[in-house]
């Protein structure tokens, strides 16, 4: 006989208030966990937190459930159902069918403990479809599903799940921080109401998860709008300007602290080009997870940003990029100017969409004529790239006496996205994301000699319609007129009689006689 009272299940963290703990029947809850051992411990504590008469089933992915899940003799249900499944995408799709072959899911709590990074290679569309299916199934069968997902790179997935509030009743993550854990609750819906953006410190002692005592009386975090979290390099050696300033030695430590903030100002430092992509990922994570009240700035300490890099940081969620040539006084004024602002621009959930804006052309150097035309045409037709800012097309005709193949040997582009081809006695270059006013500087970096000494004629196109029109003309060139680089010549290297003494090579002297024996006897 089915229960008359609707069951309410609880997450396995002691002293957590009901608004953030209860899971009534008829919904799906999702927990991201950094470590697999924490996922197992949380699942066992959740089992022990249920009533004695509760119906509980645990599904383990890619492991034996009998070895990792256990009943507590002093608390929890009298018995639980154990299931195992393969770490495969198809197993997730057939999960509901397989469960219903064994039990009646009505009023059950199902705990699915995934394998490490199990969802990493599953596309976002299929994840959304699966969540929608599980949501409908749990409501139809009046049961609850708790997904505990361990993985060391869950930020991308967490950002995606933030928008799945129609399919998920709760979304939280448990982050390992050494001596304790940070419980980050994005949203949690139950019979007590809706809670969102909660961050609490929890600890594990003897397999029991508890709320840190200092957190118990504080439900909502205090306002941190006046806080300024900054990389120490931003102030150029100056001490913190007030009690609201907090300095960090590097961007990684700053990022971890910013994940606990709500409306603070975060100022990153950019000192080299290699930091751009990691910094963009950090900014994207903060903006997607911490919301629009946080102010995020990037201080360029050395000249390392191209226009497209700055556009990437702003698209990932930065409020402002402070240029490298701005003095400290100007930098502080710009930090002050963003106070009270709300970030209003849309930030895509998948950062790969934004990263494709910086390097959509993953080619460099010489390309065949048709490959070159197709690559540039794809750039022109990319809707994610800014209009009239995709790059510069340059056609160069060598001076008399220099073949175009010889001029090609002097063309040495260093950036990914800078490509060239030859045909019709012309050397044609496409410099991606190069501004027209920076063209001469770019050419001076590409050619070791002044271009005026190598080429007699230069034509430039920098607007999208101009480049597209020139591509139409380039495609009309017959394949017989397409050029190819000069073949590489390998000169034979003579064998040197030498030995290495541990520091450098030394030639071994060979004795030589100026006169043979016959000449010596005659003398």
UniProtKB/Swiss-Prot annotation:
Where does the record place a coiled coil?
A: none
Could you tell me the keywords of this UniProt record?
Cellulose biosynthesis, Nucleotide-binding
Recorded hits in Pfam families, A to Z, give: CBP_BcsE
Q: Which molecular-function annotation in GO is an example for this chain?
A: cyclic-di-GMP binding
Renumbered to this chain, region (GIL domain, sufficient for c-di-GMP binding) spans 153-492
Q: Does the keyword Repressor apply?
A: no
Q: What happens when the gene is disrupted?
A: When the bcsEFG operon is disrupted in a cellulose-synthesizing strain (a strain K12 / W3110 derivative called AR3110 with a restored, functional bcsQ gene), cellulose is no longer made.
Superkingdom in the source lineage: Bacteria
Consequence of substituting residue 364 to D: Wild-type c-di-GMP binding
A Gene Ontology BP annotation from the UniProt entry: cellulose biosynthetic process
Q: What family does the database annotate?
A: Belongs to the BcsE family.
Describe the task this protein carries out: Binds bis-(3'-5') cyclic diguanylic acid (c-di-GMP), the ability to bind c-di-GMP is important for its function.
Other observations noted: Cellulose production is abolished in E.coli K12 / MG1655 and W3110 due to a premature stop codon in bcsQ.
Q: Any domain commentary?
A: The central domain (GIL, residues 153-492) is sufficient for c-di-GMP binding.
NCBIfam families referenced in this protein's UniProt entry, alphabetically: cellulose_bcsE, PRK15045.1
Q: What is the protein name stated in its UniProt record?
A: Cyclic di-GMP binding protein BcsE
The organism named in the record is Escherichia coli (strain K12)
- Lineage in the entry? Bacteria, Pseudomonadati, Pseudomonadota, Gammaproteobacteria, Enterobacterales
């Amino acid at each position: 006989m089915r229960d008359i009272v609707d069951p309410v299940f609880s997450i396995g963290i002691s002293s957590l208030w009901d608004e953030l703990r209860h899971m009534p029947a008829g919904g799906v809850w999702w927990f991201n966990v950094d470590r697999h051992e924490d996922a197992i411990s949380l699942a066992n504590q959740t089992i022990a937190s249920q009533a004695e008469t509760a119906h509980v089933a645990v599904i383990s992915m890619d492991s034996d459930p009998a070895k990792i899940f256990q009943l507590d003799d002093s608390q929890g249900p009298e018995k639980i159902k154990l299931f195992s499944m393969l770490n495969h995408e198809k197993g997730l799709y057939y999960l509901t069918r397989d469960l219903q072959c064994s039990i009646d899911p009505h009023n059950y709590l199902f705990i699915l403990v995934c394998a490490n990074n199990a969802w990493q290679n599953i596309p976002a569309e299929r994840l959304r479809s699966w969540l929608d299916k599980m949501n409908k199934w749990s409501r139809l069968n009046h049961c609850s599903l708790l997904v505990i997902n361990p993985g060391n790179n869950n930020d991308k997935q967490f950002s995606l799940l933030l928008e799945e509030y129609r399919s998920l009743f709760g979304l939280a993550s448990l982050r390992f921080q050494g001596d304790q854990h940070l419980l980050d609750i994005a949203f949690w819906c139950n019979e007590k109401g809706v809670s969102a953006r909660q961050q609490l410190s929890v600890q594990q002692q003897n397999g029991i998860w508890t709320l840190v005592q200092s957190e118990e009386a504080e439900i909502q975090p205090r306002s941190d709008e006046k806080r300024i979290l900054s990389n120490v390099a931003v102030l150029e050696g100056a001490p913190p300007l007030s009690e609201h300033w907090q300095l960090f030695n590097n961007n990684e430590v700053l990022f971890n602290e910013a994940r606990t903030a709500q409306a603070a100002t975060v100022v990153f430092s950019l000192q080299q080009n290699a930091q751009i992509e990691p910094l963009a990922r950090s900014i994207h994570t903060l903006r997607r997870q911490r919301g629009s009240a946080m102010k995020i700035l990037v201080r360029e300490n050395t000249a390392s940003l191209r226009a497209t890099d700055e556009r990437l940081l702003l698209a990932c969620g930065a409020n402002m990029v402070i240029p490298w040539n701005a003095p400290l006084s100007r930098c502080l004024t710009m930090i002050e100017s963003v106070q009270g602002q709300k970030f209003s621009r849309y930030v895509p959930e998948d950062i790969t969409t934004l990263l494709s804006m910086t390097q959509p052309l993953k080619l460099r150097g010489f390309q065949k004529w048709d490959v070159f035309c197709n690559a540039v045409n794809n750039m022109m037709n990319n809707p994610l790239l800014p209009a009239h800012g995709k790059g510069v097309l340059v056609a160069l005709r060598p001076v008399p006496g220099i073949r175009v193949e010889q001029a090609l040997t002097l063309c040495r582009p260093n950036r990914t996205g800078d490509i060239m081809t030859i045909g019709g006695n012309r050397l044609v270059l496409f410099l991606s994301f190069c501004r027209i006013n920076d063209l001469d500087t770019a050419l001076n970096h590409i050619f070791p000699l002044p271009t005026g000494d190598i080429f007699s004629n230069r034509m430039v196109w920098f607007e999208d319609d101009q480049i597209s029109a020139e591509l139409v003309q380039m495609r009309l060139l017959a394949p017989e007129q397409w050029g190819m680089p000069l073949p590489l010549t390998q000169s034979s290297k003579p064998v040197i009689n030498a030995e290495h003494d541990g520091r450098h090579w030394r030639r071994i002297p060979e004795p030589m006689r100026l006169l043979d024996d016959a000449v010596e006897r005659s003398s």
